[in-house]
Each structure stands twice: as C-alpha cells, then as structure tokens.
C-alpha cells in the first residue's frame, strides 16, 4: 500500500507534556503504524513546509477491553515526536493551542 503524506500523519497529540515540548520545537503526531521515520520526516516537511532535524517513534500496543463476556482489542498505534531545525518556523497548526 502506497502511503501519501496525508495518510501518514493521522492527528496531532495534544497533551500537557506535548504542549510543553513545543517550546523546544518538538511536535507529537499519531502516525500510520506502517510508516517509518524517513516517511514521517518527508510527510511533515511536505504538509507543514518546515525542516525536520530528528524523528523519534514510539510503538504502542492497543489495550484489551472487555464488555461482559465479550473481549475486544483497541488498535495498535504509533506516535512520532518530530524535532524541527532552529531556523525552521513553527507549525501553524499548533499556534492557536498554546
């Protein structure tokens, strides 16, 4: 399956910790589970028109949930923490959230 830039970046992660990291030009996104670091870097540079210095990824396993006798599982996920270069501008998507 060929992933486009908009397929790779699912949604931003808005938490207290991720908001504090924005001061250091670190932005957190939920990304496609099959995307690798170079694909995430290319996608962020294309979509937001910024320069990426570093990408760290975290794989998360979905929790097992029960509803009575029925057992289900939430989807696995991947988060990417993207660090921008010093001369790069901030991502406008997050500007209104601070």
Swiss-Prot record:
Subunit text: Part of the 50S ribosomal subunit. Contacts protein L29, and trigger factor when it is bound to the ribosome.
Family note: Belongs to the universal ribosomal protein uL23 family.
Native source species: Clostridium botulinum (strain Eklund 17B / Type B)
Listed name of the protein: Large ribosomal subunit protein uL23
A GO term, aspect molecular function: structural constituent of ribosome
NCBIfam families named among the record's database cross-references: PRK05738.2-4 (NF004363)
HAMAP family named in the record: Ribosomal_uL23_B
Single GO biological process annotation from the record: translation
Listed InterPro entries: Nucleotide-bd_a/b_plait_sf (IPR012677), Ribosomal_uL23-like (IPR013025), Ribosomal_uL23/eL15/eS24_sf (IPR012678), Ribosomal_uL23_CS (IPR001014)
Keywords associated with the record: Ribonucleoprotein, Ribosomal protein, RNA-binding, rRNA-binding
Name of the coding gene: rplW
Top-level taxon of origin: Bacteria
GO cellular component entries: ribonucleoprotein complex; ribosome
UniProt function note: One of the early assembly proteins it binds 23S rRNA. One of the proteins that surrounds the polypeptide exit tunnel on the outside of the ribosome. Forms the main docking site for trigger factor binding to the ribosome.
Keyword rRNA-binding annotated: yes
Keyword check for rRNA-binding: yes
